[in-house]
A protein has these predicted regions:
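Face-selective signature of the C-terminal outer-membrane beta-barrel domain
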Residues: 264-292, 342-374
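Transmembrane beta-strands of outer-membrane beta-barrel proteins
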Residues: 103-105, 131-133, 175-177, 282-284, ...
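Periplasmic plug
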Residues: 17-20, 26-76
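Outer-membrane beta-barrel translocator/receptor signature
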Residues: 42-44, 56, 65-74, 79-161, ...
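Transmembrane beta-barrel architecture of outer-membrane proteins
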Residues: 24, 44, 49, 87, ...
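Structural signature of outer-membrane beta-barrel domains
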Residues: 34, 110-112, 138-142, 182-188, ...
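Residue-level signature of outer-membrane beta-barrel architecture
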Residues: 49-51, 74, 123, 165-168, ...
Length: 374
C-alpha cells in the first residue's frame, strides 16, 4: 500500500525522495535532482494536488489519504505545469463525493506504539450536492534513544483532514470545493545520523567510512577559526570533539538537545467546470494555501566534552577557570536559551508562507486529429 512518498518511491522506478537540510524535501527523477537550500532556490519537480501546486515539503510530512489516484509524469512538463517541472510532475488527485452514502475506517498498529488510522465519510445530501470528509492520523513513539537527555526521539505525531464538496449547478456546470489541512508536532530528526572518521584537514576523512555518531574534527572546518577569533580558543589547532562518546549505533545518539518539529499547512481550492459546448470546456481554478513551519536540530551530532579554554593554552592556570555564558539560539519568538561552555551547532528553519494561484483553461474536444489546451 502506498501511504506516503517513501512508499511511492518504492513502486516508481527512478524516483528518489529524502528529507533535506532546511524545511524541504529532496527529489530526484531519473537522475535529475535539485538539492540547493535557500530562499532563491526552486525545486525542479512539481507536486500538485488536483492540478495546482501543493508543495512537496508539506506533503512529505503527513503522507497520502483518501485519494483517487497518483499521477507521476517523468521528464519536463513545463508546457502545462510551469518552468519548475524540469524533472517531472507528481499530481495527487483527491477522491470526490459519490452518489451513495458510504464510509470506511481502518487502523494499523505496530511496534513503538505505532498507530495509523484513516476515516472516510461520503455524504450525498441531494442529487446536486455531495460532500466527502476524510481524516488520517499517524502516531509513533521515538525509535532512537538520546543518551544525553534520556529521551526517545524521532517520533511521529501528525494528522491530516480534508473536506470536499461538489455542487452540480446545472447539467453543464459543476463547482468543486476542497479544503485540506495537516499538522505535525513531534521530535522527528530532520536528516539522520552522521558517519564520520575525524580528519584535521577535511573534518571528516573522505577516504574512510568512519563511525556512526562521530562528530567532525573542528580543525577541518571554519568553526576552529571562528572560535579563535572570538577568543574561545587560544589557537585554531584545537579539536572540540576529541574524546567524545561516539556510540556507533543507528538506535542511539548523543546530542545536546532533542529535535523539535512543527508544521501547520492549509490548502483551499475552488474549481469551476463549465461545458461551453460539446467541443469546448472551460475550467477555472483558484487556490489559497498557507504554511507555518519550524524545526530545530542538533547539527554537530554529538556533545563536545572539551570546554572552551579561552585565550590561555591548555595547562595554563587561567585555562582552568570555567568559560561559560547564557546563549540564546533560534531568534525572536523561536528557539531557546541555555548555558554555553563548549562547542555546539544547531540548525533552525522557520517558514511562514502564503500562496495564491489562479488559472483559467480552455480545453477542446474536436473531431479530427487536432485539439488544444489554452
Amino acid at each position: 500500500m502506498v501511504e506516503d512518498f517513501s512508499d511511492l518511491a518504492e513502486v516508481v522506478p527512478g524516483l528518489i525522495i529524502d528529507k533535506a537540510i532546511g524545511s524541504g524535501a529532496s527529489y530526484s527523477m531519473r537522475g535529475v535532482g535539485s538539492y540547493g537550500v535557500g530562499a532563491a532556490v526552486v525545486g525542479s519537480l512539481v507536486v500538485n494536488m488536483n492540478g495546482h501546486e501543493y508543495g512537496s515539503s508539506a506533503l512529505a510530512e503527513i503522507g497520502f489519504h483518501d485519494l483517487e489516484r497518483i499521477e507521476v509524469l517523468k521528464g519536463p512538463q513545463g508546457t502545462l505545469s510551469g518552468r519548475n517541472a524540469v524533472q517531472g510532475l507528481v499530481n495527487i488527485v483527491s477522491a470526490r463525493p459519490t452518489s451513495e452514502w458510504s464510509g470506511s475506517f481502518d487502523v494499523a498498529a505496530g511496534n513503538y506504539n505505532s498507530t495509523r488510522s484513516n476515516l472516510m465519510l461520503n455524504m450525498p445530501f441531494s442529487d446536486r450536492i455531495g460532500a466527502r470528509l476524510s481524516y488520517s492520523m499517524f502516531e509513533r513513539d521515538g525509535t532512537i534513544e538520546n543518551v544525553y537527555t534520556g529521551n526517545d526521539i524521532d517520533g511521529r505525531d501528525a494528522y491530516g483532514i480534508r473536506l470536499s464538496v461538489d455542487f452540480d449547478i446545472s447539467e453543464t456546470t459543476k463547482l468543486e470545493f476542497t479544503h485540506d489541512r495537516s499538522e505535525t508536532e513531534d521530535n522527528r530528526q530532520n536528516i539522520g545520523i552522521i558517519v564520520c572518521a575525524p580528519h584535521p584537514v577535511f573534518g571528516c576523512s573522505p577516504f574512510e567510512r568512519g563511525t556512526f555518531g562521530q562528530s567532525a574534527d573542528t580543525r577541518g572546518s571554519t568553526a576552529s577559526i571562528f572560535n579563535f577569533i572570538a577568543g574561545l580558543n587560544s589557537t585554531a589547532d584545537y579539536n572540540s570533539y576529541e574524546g567524545i562518546n561516539a556510540l556507533g549505533s543507528l538506535e542511539k545518539v548523543n546530542i545536546n538537545r532533542d529535535p523539535e518539529h512543527h508544521q501547520v499547512f492549509e490548502f483551499t481550492m475552488l474549481e469551476l467546470n463549465h461545458d461551453i459546448s460539446d467541443e469546448l470546456q472551460l475550467v477555472v481554478k483558484g487556490t489559497y494555501s498557507t504554511r507555518d513551519y519550524y524545526h530545530m536540530g542538533d547539527n554537530d551530532y554529538n556533545v563536545a566534552v572539551s570546554p572552551f579554554p579561552g585565550l590561555f593554552p591548555p595547562g595554563h592556570p587561567a585555562a582552568a577557570i570555567p568559560m561559560q555564558w547564557t546563549g540564546c539560539f533560534g531568534g525572536e519568538g523561536y528557539g531557546f536559551c541555555e548555558i554555553v561552555d563548549s562547542d555546539r551547532t544547531y540548525e533552525f528553519a522557520v517558514v511562514e508562507s502564503e500562496t495564491r494561484q489562479l488559472e483559467a483553461t480552455l480545453i477542446s474536444n474536436l473531431d479530427g486529429p487536432i485539439n488544444f489546451v489554452a
